[in-house]
Amino acid sequence: VSVEQLATRNKIASAAYADAQTSVGTGTLSITVNGESFSVDVESGSDSLEAIRAAINDAEDNVGVSASIVNDENGAQLVLTSDNSGVENAIAVSVTTDLADTGDLSQLSYDPNAGSNPMIEKVAALDSIIEVDGFTQTSSDLTVAGMIEGVTFNLSEARPGEKMTVDVSLDTNAVKRAVEGFVQAYNNLNT
């Protein structure tokens, strides 16, 4: 068995702004994850990084993206993180700006298929990849099931190219607990 890669959640970040209260412009952000989209209207007076973060997180139709603000030595950045791991959960952000927009909301756009974007990918959306006896299986999370009948691999660390030996055995304690639970339930029913 070789764990070639672990699934990760996509994370993208804006350029740095002076602070989280900085106005970034007005318009509409359309955020897409796994083929589903939702929109956030950004209006004058609620166009700061803080307000946009809140609008994304509070959107009732949010399709699986969490927004946060990270402050580093360069300033405040809006960070979007996919709620689920895997390639299909890559984040895309398109922007429609208002004609009267004096800011530059388009700096919050991101296309995972484009070579250059205003927002920067901090963590790529990846699937887990496991190899067993020359057979490869991918999974959008850290669990690989069905590759070998009755066996589920719970992945915790990738070691590309490094082969590991896995012993598969029956968990007799789990069987014992299941039988004891059945007997207890049966006895409770008959008393």
Task: Tell what function each PLM region has.
Residues 1-76, 81-189:
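Bacterial flagellar/type III secretion structural subunits and associated motility module proteins
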